[in-house]
Amino acid sequence: MKILGIDPGTKNCGYAILEKSKFKTILLEAGLIKIKPNTLQYQITELCEGLDLIFKNHKFDEVAIEDIFFAYNPKTVLKLAQFRGALSLKILQLHGDFAEYTPLQVKKTVTGKAKADKEQVAFMVKKILGINKEIKPLDITDAIAIALTHANNLRIN
């Protein structure tokens, strides 16, 4: 089963592709859709074009995305919500249904602690998948954690 995990952001959008079998989970690919500073419309276009490319190169059984987190800056929340809306529409067009997980759900699944920081998540992602090299930036490890959370949720259900 091939799972795409997506960590939406306004500067970078992390993505990770996992192959899950009955006995193991393998990281096939992970990276960033880089979003250059520009008008919101062009940034959303870049995000959607990046997602198009990922779906053009892969077929997925499942897609999971991180839900919007709480932020203190209303402008940031509004921009992220617009990115998230465009991303949701694009995923529905390219794939269909997708799963959503809050940051707390992802942290709890991967580290066992809902209040874990990004470095703890990155450490556990590498440990779970048996990866020895550093994975940067943290947007990528977050995307992997989202995919792992979905893989775990599928196993439970």
From Swiss-Prot:
SUPFAM superfamilies reported for this sequence: Ribonuclease H-like (SSF53098)
Keyword Magnesium applies: yes
BP GO annotations: DNA recombination; DNA repair
Catalytic EC class: hydrolase
Keyword field: Cytoplasm, DNA damage, DNA recombination, DNA repair, DNA-binding, Endonuclease, Hydrolase, Magnesium, Metal-binding, Nuclease
Subunit structure: Homodimer which binds Holliday junction (HJ) DNA. The HJ becomes 2-fold symmetrical on binding to RuvC with unstacked arms; it has a different conformation from HJ DNA in complex with RuvA. In the full resolvosome a probable DNA-RuvA(4)-RuvB(12)-RuvC(2) complex forms which resolves the HJ.
Name of the protein in its database record: Crossover junction endodeoxyribonuclease RuvC
